[in-house]
Amino acid sequence: MRHTATDTFIQFYDSPLGKLAMRSDGSALIGLGLVSKQAAVAAIAGSRPQEKSLLIFQETVRWLDSYFRGRAPSFTPKLKLSGSDFQKRVCEIMLTIPFGKTVTYGEIAARIARERGIPRMSAQAVGGAVGANPILIIVPCHRVIGAGGNLTGYGAGMERKIQLLKLEKSI
């Protein structure tokens, strides 16, 4: 069955962090987030997602099952990153952070500055892009930390960031 560009599908996953909502456009994962009292559906910008079993959700469940067993998954589900070019680039860089490792906002900023051939990039700008990540856990924004190893904010809450880093034995 072909899906239109506006189709949005959702499926839920019970994780050690709480219930997660997986969102897809029918072929790629477009969102993964914790279901909150505000409801994950509110994050889908006014669309009415259909709950449906899709291959991308099956792949994502396999990835999450492996991850929550404390193993680095051997594959990444097909992702469709959203946001500005800068936000997408930050997400691409986060995808290269190995399981069990962390990097700082400043390290990502320095990498982007080198790529752009500019002297510096703001770590705060990187922080804004990290905070806009729509695909938690798989795009591992929890692996990005502050200068000096300081743990800083996480959209799903600091206690969950700590839980994920402990699972990966990063702290």
Model-predicted segments: where are they?
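DNA-contacting interfaces and partner/effector-binding or oligomerization modules
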Residues: M1-S24, A28-I30, Q38
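Nucleic acid-binding interface residues in structured DNA/RNA-binding domains
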Residues: H3-P16, R62, R69-I171
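A generic structural signal for ordered secondary structure
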Residues: K19, S24, L54, V126-G127
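A sequence-level detector of short linear motifs
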Residues: A21-M22, G31, T104, G153
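Compact structured core domains
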Residues: S24-T76
